[in-house]
């Protein structure tokens, strides 16, 4: 992705500020520019250097490539960077992208071996029925996306089929293909199956729910599952 002017200040803020409280693990600073400029800005200031990242200089924030296609996988492999795949909303090319990334990976100073992160939607609750109910908020959000009508997350409803058309259901469900919805046991089985399939090194978990307390509880259940 190019760096339009209106993103420069945002990138400067992210590249410097996120590394402070979360050293060594910056996903918001995923590489938008792949020609080495960011690596130079995040390293020590060299004599005669005319442009300095403030904050950011000498932070050595790790760069990532985030993608949803084979192109991103090829770029991450060529530059020896960690690769994050946006399978939480664009899962179509996941398997091919991971295979491409791993097969073509070139070691770099930052990363000696391939390191893959994948996005996954997980909505966990005390029961499968409650989780399915809570998941309707995210399903409505994707139906609205299909309609071109972006809205804030809506409260869950009893019957999602009253909200979307068959075509919207098909398209939204395809985008949400990488979703695990259920109680702790269901989530555990789903995560194990996903890791067995992808051999991912890390998961980026999205738990998009209307009720903040329910969302926090979802993450608690997920955390307990992953500890086991």
Predicted segments — roles?
Residues 1, 63-66, 83-86, 114-121, ...:
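Hydrophobic faces of well-ordered beta-strands that scaffold small-molecule active sites
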Residues 57-67, 175-184:
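Active-site mouth loops of central-metabolism enzymes
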Residues 195-228:
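Generic C-terminus detector
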């Amino acid at each position: 992705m190019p760096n339009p002017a209106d993103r420069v200040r945002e990138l400067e803020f992210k590249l410097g500020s996120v590394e402070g409280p979360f050293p060594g693990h910056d996903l918001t600073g995923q590489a938008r520019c792949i020609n080495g400029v960011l690596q130079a800005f995040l390293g020590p200031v060299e004599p005669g250097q005319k442009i300095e990242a403030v904050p950011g200089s000498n932070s050595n924030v790790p760069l990532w490539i985030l993608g949803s296609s084979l192109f991103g996988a090829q770029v991450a492999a060529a530059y020896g960077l960690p690769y994050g795949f946006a399978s939480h909303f664009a899962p179509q090319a996941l398997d091919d992208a991971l295979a491409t990334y791993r097969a073509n990976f070139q070691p770099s100073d930052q990363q000696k071996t391939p390191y893959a992160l994948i996005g996954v939607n997980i909505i966990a609750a005390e029961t499968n029925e409650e989780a399915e109910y809570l998941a309707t908020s995210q399903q409505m959000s994707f139906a609205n996306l299909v309609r071109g009508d972006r809205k804030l997350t809506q409260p869950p409803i009893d019957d999602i089929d009253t909200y979307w058309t068959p075509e919207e259901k098909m398209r939204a469900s395809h985008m949400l293909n990488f979703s695990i919805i259920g109680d702790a046991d269901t989530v555990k089985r789903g995560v194990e199956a996903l890791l067995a399939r992808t051999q991912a090194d890390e998961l980026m978990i999205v738990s998009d729910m209307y009720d903040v307390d329910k969302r926090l509880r979802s993450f608690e259940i997920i955390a307990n599952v992953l500890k086991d």
